[in-house]
Amino acid sequence: MRLIQNMCTIAEYPAPGSTAADCCLGAAGRRLVKIAVVGASGVGKTALVVRFLTKRFIGDYERNAGNLYTRQVHIEGETLAIQVQDTPGIQVHENGLSCSEQLNRCIRWADAVVLVFSITDHKSYELISQLHQHVQQLHPGTRLPVVLVANKADLLHVKQVDPQLGLQLASMLGCSFYEVSVSENYNDVYNAFHVLCKEVSPKQQPSSTPEKRRTSLIPRPKSPNMQDLKRRFKQALSAKVRTVTSV
């Protein structure tokens, strides 16, 4: 899979035929793949999405912004339009999983789901089984493609979840598993999305097919400016250089 350079970040799911849709989805007839990234708060969902789409790690993100990112990818000889929906963190209460209607709409909208937990947070791992069941319940009669991602693999000194547990869980759920460090390794992040796109793409209709859902998936999400992301990345890089120089 090869990422194509132009990328859009949009606050609402664009109506087909609109300027935003033309910008983000490209030429008519290109298949559209819609992916929702879901997990507990603080596991690195936004960082994972931005890393995949830009190859960069900034390290400073606004939590629970609920942004919808769009770009084109080239996979096995075909150019796809891919939309990745970042979602607010899921809360767990005594009565079980607490999913807002906005989150449910995102999951129903998606063609595939990335389930994310952090190796530094065992509760985020425990949440995955319930979350996977909830995802499948929102897609009755079909088995939605899913990939399981364990993030923060570089933080071994505070690890609470061993890789073997992730593998066992993925085997039980019937999905692929990747342990990644979003901050240090782009290739593992790339591979996780690559596998998911391969599972989804043969089944999808061209992006010119009218979409029933034209409303915002999450009300009034704040759409980050990509120039601002680049600026913050440069600032973070400059700060690291100054630190090394002063030592």
Curated annotation (Swiss-Prot):
Cleaved signal peptide residues: none
Any one of the GO BP annotations: negative regulation of transforming growth factor beta receptor signaling pathway
GO MF, one annotated term: GTP binding
Record Gene3D superfamilies: P-loop containing nucleotide triphosphate hydrolases (3.40.50.300)
Reactions performed catalytically: GTP + H2O = GDP + phosphate + H(+)
Record has GTP-binding as a keyword: yes
PROSITE patterns reported in the protein's UniProt record: RAS
Region (Disordered): 202-228
Domain of life of the organism encoding this protein: Eukaryota
Keyword field contains Cell membrane: no
EC number(s) stated in the UniProt entry for this protein: 3.6.5.2
Enzyme class at the top of the EC tree: hydrolase
Keywords: GTP-binding, Hydrolase, Nucleotide-binding
Entry binding sites for GTP: 39-46, 86-93, 151-154
Region (Small GTPase-like): 28-245
InterPro entries the record matches: P-loop_NTPase, Ras-related_GTPase, Small_GTP-bd, Small_GTPase
Family: Belongs to the small GTPase superfamily. Ras family.
UniProt xrefs under PANTHER family: RAS-LIKE FAMILY MEMBER 11 (PTHR45704)
Protein name: Ras-like protein family member 11B
Source organism phylogeny: Eukaryota, Metazoa, Chordata, Craniata, Vertebrata
Recorded name of the encoding gene: Rasl11b
